[in-house]
């Protein structure tokens, strides 16, 4: 006597943040008639084709945008493909179109291919909203560097030294110009 067919979904679903590659979960190792496959059989989870593209098993999409999930699987005889959303059947066929994505449609999707000989399960894909862009934080006020700050007496001293330096520069330039003019007059006087 054969065991009753059980749910094709795993007892312990694989977390979406860690895309699976293989499993040995006996719940996934049932044929369509409900018979057991050998317990040491390694079941390969097949990836889905998605739009937008899934990264590490996660599709990030804005609300009201379309999401397309597709699973191309080759089995003999031809399988029946059924889609699940968080463990609940939600569609049939090779493609699942989610038009105008809403908050209620965010979650984990899987596809199950069943024929008279066996059953295959796709890798789970989680649809989520994009992570918000972090706003820049307010800059903390910087403390002035005490070695470069001027205040009080040192500021007045620097200002006075600057004024005296500028005065000396101007006086030196005037002296050079006057000397140059005197020298030119003396040359003219000698030549005449």
From Swiss-Prot:
PROSITE patterns, per the entry: IG_LIKE
InterPro entries documented for this protein: Ig-like_dom, Ig-like_dom_sf, Ig-like_fold
Amino acid composition bias (Pro residues), ranges on this chain: 7-18
GO aspect biological process, one term: osteoclast differentiation
Location in or out of the cell: Cell membrane
GO cellular component assignments: plasma membrane
Annotated region (Disordered), positions in chain: 1-26
Sites where a glycan is attached: 64
Topology relative to the membrane: Single-pass membrane protein
Keyword Electron transport among UniProt keywords: no
Keywords: Cell membrane, Glycoprotein, Immunoglobulin domain, Membrane, Transmembrane, Transmembrane helix
Domain of life assignment: Eukaryota
Ranges where the Ig-like domain occurs: 20-128
Transmembrane segments: 158-178
Task of the protein: May be involved in osteoclast differentiation.
Protein name per the record: Immunoglobulin superfamily member 23
Source organism per UniProt: Homo sapiens (Human)
Lineage of producing organism: Eukaryota, Metazoa, Chordata, Craniata, Vertebrata
Primary gene name: IGSF23
